[in-house]
């Protein structure tokens, strides 16, 4: 074993990590240090991440029999003002809900909370959420492949896992994720030795830190190195924006990152589980082609342009059915349960207000035809497949990217699709 070196001390006047948050107040964040024991159970090893309202730490679970191997967890320590925050409570409730049926074959592909507790800090209690540690987000894993493209054979394996996870969310937990993106699909560790090696390296080469006003702030260490094998499983994670599909009222408020907005979200005709199916369909392009399906959805100033997004949908999928436009007209005056600020900060109560509609006239015609690309076809955007494999893939994806939510296949139905069953080179 090599000798441990002293940690690098960073300049006190150079902001790092959570200090860069606008309006940063150190009193909001619990001071956590390697070796600390949280909840008399979780011994802190290293800081592995941070966000606007939390820091994330790798910890050793000390509640195990002496003959068992080490067990590690990640502890998300939220800011003090998050204990009573509805978002933090919401995530806590949703993640508990996700344990409804651990025997379902999709359960292993959903990241669930292992424990939660409160830690007392200077400004009051801090809500702490405990999860299984994960190696890396899908976007980082993609970078390990040429041009960011997952090989079709591996993509099919991962899609089968993700669809099982979605089926579990939808059919068993009655949860709509609403925020499926590369950041929120995490990959596990290929072998426990990867974590053990990481912990050993932390002991030999501690995290750089800075000390300001008696408080240590650490530079995250979260690089676990290249995978030793690709037998690592993906999990759907981050349920902070997830919604229950069991309510009696229609769900209408805006969801999803702009790239992944489903048509019914943009048109305000209410959404349900099928919005996740659209979301995954769009995400598949990035996983397979290393680029976005909808490439021209921003203005010259970089702002999201709903008109351009709908125009690109029309170019790739054809015009929306008249029934959807009629539905949009009927729903246009229905107000959301609460006002939501748009990108300009204006409080909006309908999809038309929020997204700047209407976009179609009463005859169902798109009002911005000049924005529709004339040289864009769905078939031409698939470059990684050929022949029968490409034909089967297009049939598969078209069952996800349907204008009408009710026309999309469910996650369970998609698992039986011929493209997922066929072998890819």
Feature map (PLM): residue ranges:
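Intrinsically disordered, low-complexity regulatory segments of kinases
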Residues: 1-425
């Amino acid at each position: 074993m090599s000798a441990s070196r002293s940690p690098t001390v960073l300049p006190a006047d150079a902001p790092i990590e959570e200090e860069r948050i606008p309006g940063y107040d150190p009193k909001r964040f619990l001071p956590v240090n390697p070796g600390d024991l949280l909840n008399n159970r979780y011994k802190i090893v290293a800081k592995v991440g941070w966000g606007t309202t939390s820091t994330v730490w790798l910890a050793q679970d000390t509640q195990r029999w002496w003959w068992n191997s080490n067990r590690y967890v990640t502890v998300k320590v939220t800011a003090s003002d998050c204990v009573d925050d509805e978002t933090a409570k919401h995530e806590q409730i949703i993640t508990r809900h996700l344990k409804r049926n651990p025997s379902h074959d999709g359960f292993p592909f959903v990241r669930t909370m292992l424990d939660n507790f409160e830690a007392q800090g200077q400004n009051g209690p801090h809500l702490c959420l405990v999860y299984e540690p994960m190696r890396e987000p899908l976007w980082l894993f993609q970078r390990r492949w040429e041009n960011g493209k997952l090989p079709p054979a591996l993509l099919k394996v991962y899609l089968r896992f993700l669809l099982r996870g979605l089926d579990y969310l939808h059919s068993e937990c009655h949860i709509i994720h609403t925020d499926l993106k590369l950041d929120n699909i995490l990959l596990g560790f290929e072998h426990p030795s990867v974590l053990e090696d990481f912990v050993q390296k932390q002991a030999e080469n501690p995290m750089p830190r800075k000390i300001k006003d008696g408080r240590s702030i650490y530079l995250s260490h979260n690089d676990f190195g290249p995978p030793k094998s690709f037998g690592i499983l993906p999990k759907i994670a981050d349920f902070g924006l997830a919604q229950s599909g069991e309510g009696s009222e229609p769900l209408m408020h805006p969801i999803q990152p702009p790239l992944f907005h489903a048509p019914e979200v943009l048109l305000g005709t209410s959404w349900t589980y099928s919005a996740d199916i659209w979301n995954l369909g769009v995400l598949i392009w990035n996983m397979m082609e290393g680029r976005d399906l909808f490439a021209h959805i921003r203005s010259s100033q970089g702002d999201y342009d709903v008109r351009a997004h709908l125009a690109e949908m029309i170019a790739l999928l054809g015009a929306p059915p008249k029934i959807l436009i009629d539905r949009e007209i009927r729903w246009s005056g229905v107000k959301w349960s609460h006002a939501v600020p748009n990108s300009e900060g204006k409080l909006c109560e309908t999809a038309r207000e929020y997204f700047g509609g209407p976009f179609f006239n009463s005859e169902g015609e798109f009002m911005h035809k000049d924005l529709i690309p004339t040289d864009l076809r769905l078939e031409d955007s698939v470059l990684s497949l050929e022949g029968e494999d490409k034909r089967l893939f297009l049939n598969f994806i078209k069952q996800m990217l349907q204008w009408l939510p009710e026309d999309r296949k469910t996650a369970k139905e998609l698992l039986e699709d011929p493209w997922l069953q066929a072998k890819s080179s």
